[in-house]
Amino acid sequence: MKLHTAVHTAIVAAAAFAALAGCSMMPASLGGWTALVDGGKGLENFDRIGNSNWRVEEGAIVADRNPDKTPSYLVTRTSYTNFVIKAEFWASADANSGIFSRCKEPKNVGDETCYEANIYDQRPDPSYGTGAIVKVAKVDPMPKAGGKWNTYEITMNGPHLQVVLNGQKTVDIQDSKLSAGPVALQHGTGTIKFRKVEIRPL
């Protein structure tokens, strides 16, 4: 009986150790980062607004069709104040997309209610196109993201807002219009793929 108990205790202890070791290796918790999108995983982390055909395809979360012709969003269920977002995305040349932050109205996402780091190479006014924060911080010249994989790093720390696209700083300003809220991923037109999106609170 004692031997059985000892063996059982050892098995439970080993299982607990293995579980802890496994958790410590999870990318979602490494260095304070939380994975919102990790390859084809992550749709469950968002609420959907609109009718774009968000789906998992070839290791990414993808949308390329919107029957309503109005922007659609994946909106986090968590609100964030100060943070860094890192994202890997692919956009077609005609894509209209973006990463929205500090959305004060989670059910009414837009460039008036959020900070939008734009992904829109063909925007009629390119000063607020790809790399800009729409209606807040312009870019000149506008970088292009279409037809390739790109990286975005978006930092919001109090009024300090910074955007880095493919290693190039495109925005570095002070603005206090919005202070906290969810993060949202947009599909408007064209094809957008998110392979990685992670966030770390500051």
Where are these regions (language model features)?
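Bacterial N-terminal signal peptides that target proteins for export
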Residues: 2-11
